[in-house]
From Swiss-Prot:
Protein name: Surface presentation of antigens protein SpaM
UniProt function note: Required for surface presentation of invasion plasmid antigens. Could play a role in preserving the translocation competence of the ipa antigens. Required for invasion.
Superkingdom classification of source: Bacteria
Taxonomic lineage: Bacteria, Pseudomonadati, Pseudomonadota, Gammaproteobacteria, Enterobacterales
InterPro entries: Salm_SPAgM (IPR002954)
Keywords of the record: Plasmid, Virulence
One Pfam family linked to the record: SPAM
């Protein structure tokens, strides 16, 4: 984008420098006008390229924003799943402790 901006500025300055000053011959005026037309063509070309690039950058930024939103949703779901897994593991561990304690008491009193 910066390179295109610099080109546009360069050609705008060139266009201003080419403006005829003082008395000139007809052929010089036509030559100058032709050069100005070429410069204007370049200016329009670079400005349109800049507009196209800016539009493409906006599209890419929109895609990035959508991807980030999806990533946040997935991370949130992953967090919920991890919390549930943690609760299940904790509950299973607590159950196992209770079962171990009960089996120790059963062995203490001779019950299998």
């Amino acid at each position: 984008m910066e390179a295109l901006d610099k080109r546009i500025i360069y050609f705008l300055q060139l266009e201003n420098d080419l403006e005829p000053v003082g008395a000139q011959s007809v052929s010089q005026l036509f030559n100058t006008r032709r050069k100005i037309a070429i410069v204007k063509k370049h200016i329009i070309q670079y400005q349109s390229e800049r507009i196209l690039l800016k539009g493409r950058i906006e599209e890419i930024q929109k895609d990035i924003d959508e991807a980030n939103a999806s990533k946040r949703k997935l991370l949130h779901k992953e967090s919920k799943i991890c919390k549930r897994i943690g609760l299940i593991k904790r509950n299973n561990f607590a159950k196992q402790l209770i079962l171990d304690e009960l089996s120790q008491e059963d062995m203490k009193y001779g019950i299998r």
